[in-house]
């Protein structure tokens, strides 16, 4: 490929540490360098990459070029209007360190703060508040994009001439162009603490009923589910940002209600035995985690990191799955197919697939993104070791049940669904392709994910 940028060949994987492929990684510092690269790129040869936190391979391009956008990391807070302008390579971690002390919070945050702005838009990430406030793209005001010809576009959701391209880009997994900058709305806060209600449930039925009942009462809601427990017991945590009166009542050790200091507690070792996570160890962990949670507690004040990003407390926690790596199976189905939550957990138990991180959330209304994942209903995410015998066959069977119910899988977590499953479960695919073809007529952008899904 002709490029004015030095390139370094690297082996890349997603966060699941599976399906490594080699690509030439380039790290531009200016827009014109990206534009030059795109103008001279052959078809199906380029994809962008942030911090590599997608679990599968959407930020890989075997034998092609991967654009590392880490140098596009500027952050500009507009306190008067409550908005943020940021480069696509700016991480949510870096943004939080700027906005929380200033009295603002992200409109949506996924389960890790080590995601870039570009990645959050490309995957249209969701959080614990989707049932109330939608996904990240719902709060984006503008996106600056370089298309497949290297031309710059300013995309906004409400402009009739750019709206379709905007929504194709949000959730489009980097396949409509290179996101270089975005402006999005923030939410005001008066403290950096979360007022949290916690409740334990001994079975899945009552847990899910409580989640439905709380849809209108809590801004944030998430449940941890014991995947190895037959009735599906779990711990439900719900809450909202604490106000100043609540902060004063807790006799805080800090004099600053907006104090924010996220810290990693340790680092997982680089080499762990492949059998460390098994049914026995996960069962023991799940028992301890369930018993550790209070039966019922209201109004506990928690810091941002333990509530929103608990796994960020251990650097490189993905290493605990050993050299074979892991995958996350995350689906969404309508409320009418809520029984698939239990059926999925049962199928994983049957083949002995241990998941110590199994998360259940509620989704609200979908947005206009044709490839955006959320839709009204239930979303279950289960992390499982990739080497479990029979796992792929079981997931193929679950795929069909999800598709039959009108559901779909999350592209940012996917590492194995078929092209047929994808086409069947994303009804907006053809509309997305039309917008993609307008922005990238030579089909310069491609990833290992898009190759597998034949898009």
Language model features with spans:
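Noncatalytic alpha-helical scaffold of FAD-dependent oxidoreductases
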Residues: 1-455
């Amino acid at each position: 490929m002709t490029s004015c940028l030095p390139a370094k060949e690297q082996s890349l994987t997603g966060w699941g540490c599976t399906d490594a492929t080699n690509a030439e990684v380039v790290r531009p510092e200016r827009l014109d360098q990206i534009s030059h690269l795109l103008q001279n790129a052959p078809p199906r040869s380029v994809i962008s990459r942030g911090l590599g936190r997608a679990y599968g391979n959407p930020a890989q391009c075997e034998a092609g070029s991967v654009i590392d956008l880490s140098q596009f990391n500027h952050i500009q807070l507009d306190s008067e209007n409550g908005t943020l302008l940021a480069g696509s390579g700016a991480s949510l971690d870096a943004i939080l360190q700027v906005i929380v002390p200033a009295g603002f919070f992200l409109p949506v945050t996924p389960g890790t703060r080590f995601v870039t702005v570009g990645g959050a838009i490309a995957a249209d990430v969701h959080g614990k508040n989707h049932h109330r406030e939608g996904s990240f793209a719902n709060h984006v005001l503008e996106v600056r994009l370089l298309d497949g010809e290297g031309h710059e576009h300013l995309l906004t959701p409400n402009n009739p001439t750019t709206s379709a391209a905007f929504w194709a880009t949000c959730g489009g997994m980097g396949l409509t162009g290179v996101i270089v900058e975005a402006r999005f709305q923030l939410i005001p806060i008066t403290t950096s603490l979360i007022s949290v209600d916690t409740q334990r449930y001994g079975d899945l039925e009552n847990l899910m009923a409580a989640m439905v009942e709380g849809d209108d009462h809590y801004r944030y809601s998430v449940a941890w589910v014991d995947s190895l427990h037959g009735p599906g017991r779990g711990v439900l945590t719900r809450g909202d940002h604490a106000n100043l009166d609540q902060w004063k009542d807790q006799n805080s050790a800090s004099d600053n209600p907006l104090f924010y200091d996220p810290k990693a507690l340790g680092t997982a070792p680089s080499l762990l035995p492949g059998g460390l996570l098994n049914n026995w160890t996960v069962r023991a962990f799940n028992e301890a985690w369930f018993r550790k949670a209070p039966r019922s507690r209201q109004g506990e004040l928690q810091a941002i990191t333990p509530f929103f990003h608990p796994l960020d407390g251990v650097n490189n926690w993905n290493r605990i799955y050993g050299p074979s790596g892991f995958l996350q199976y995350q689906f969404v189905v309508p409320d009418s197919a809520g029984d698939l939550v239990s059926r999925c957990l049962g199928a994983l138990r049957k083949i002995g697939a241990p998941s110590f991180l199994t998360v259940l959330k509620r989704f609200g209304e979908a947005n206009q993104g044709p490839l955006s994942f959320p839709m009204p209903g239930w979303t279950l995410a289960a992390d499982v070791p990739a080497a479990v015998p029979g796992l792929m066959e079981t997931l193929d069977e679950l795929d069909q049940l999800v598709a039959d119910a009108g559901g779909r899988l999350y592209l940012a977590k996917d590492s194995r669904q078929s092209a047929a499953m994808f086409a069947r479960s994303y009804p907006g695919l053809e509309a997305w392709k039309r917008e993609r073809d307008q922005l990238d007529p030579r089909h310069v952008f491609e990833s290992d994910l898009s190759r597998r899904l034949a898009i």
